[in-house]
């Protein structure tokens, strides 16, 4: 049986209120609160305001990352949540973002990342846990 090193959730959010995704400050607040909702560990972050519309941002996590890119003129945001360790943390972070933005339609995909063999997986996961990742 194989194990995985992480869970990657990607989502395209359509029909989002443009006022919620136009400003860098709002995107920053949204992602930082999603980190808290997922009980994840923030290492650093970077955000950027586009002109005339939209913003992008990423939070580097001890567990991996959360990112968003927005197109308010199309009422659309794309979101990535990738974590190692407890998969429920990734789901909680993504659910927070989706619930906060209240899109009319969500196209969400979930991927297992870093599939490893059981015999090797125990060693790799143990090393990663000692490094504080998972």
UniProtKB/Swiss-Prot annotation:
Catalytic machinery residues: 64, 69, 84
Domain of life: Bacteria
Gene3D superfamilies found in the cross-reference section: S-adenosylmethionine decarboxylase
Subunit-structure text: Heterotetramer of two alpha and two beta chains arranged as a dimer of alpha/beta heterodimers.
Cellular component aspect of the GO annotation: cytosol
GO molecular function: adenosylmethionine decarboxylase activity
Matching NCBIfam families: SAM_DCase_Bsu
Name used for this protein in its record: S-adenosylmethionine decarboxylase proenzyme
Task of the protein: Catalyzes the decarboxylation of S-adenosylmethionine to S-adenosylmethioninamine (dcAdoMet), the propylamine donor required for the synthesis of the polyamines spermine and spermidine from the diamine putrescine.
Keywords, comma-separated and alphabetical: Autocatalytic cleavage, Decarboxylase, Lyase, Polyamine biosynthesis, Pyruvate, S-adenosyl-L-methionine, Schiff base, Spermidine biosynthesis, Zymogen
Family to which the UniProt record says this protein belongs: Belongs to the prokaryotic AdoMetDC family. Type 1 subfamily.
Residues bearing PTM Pyruvic acid (Ser): 64
EC top class named in words: lyase
Originating gene: speH
PTM (free text): Is synthesized initially as an inactive proenzyme. Formation of the active enzyme involves a self-maturation process in which the active site pyruvoyl group is generated from an internal serine residue via an autocatalytic post-translational modification. Two non-identical subunits are generated from the proenzyme in this reaction, and the pyruvate is formed at the N-terminus of the alpha chain, which is derived from the carboxyl end of the proenzyme.
Parts of the chain that traverse the membrane: none
Cofactor(s) required for function per UniProt: pyruvate
Pfam families, sorted: AdoMet_dc
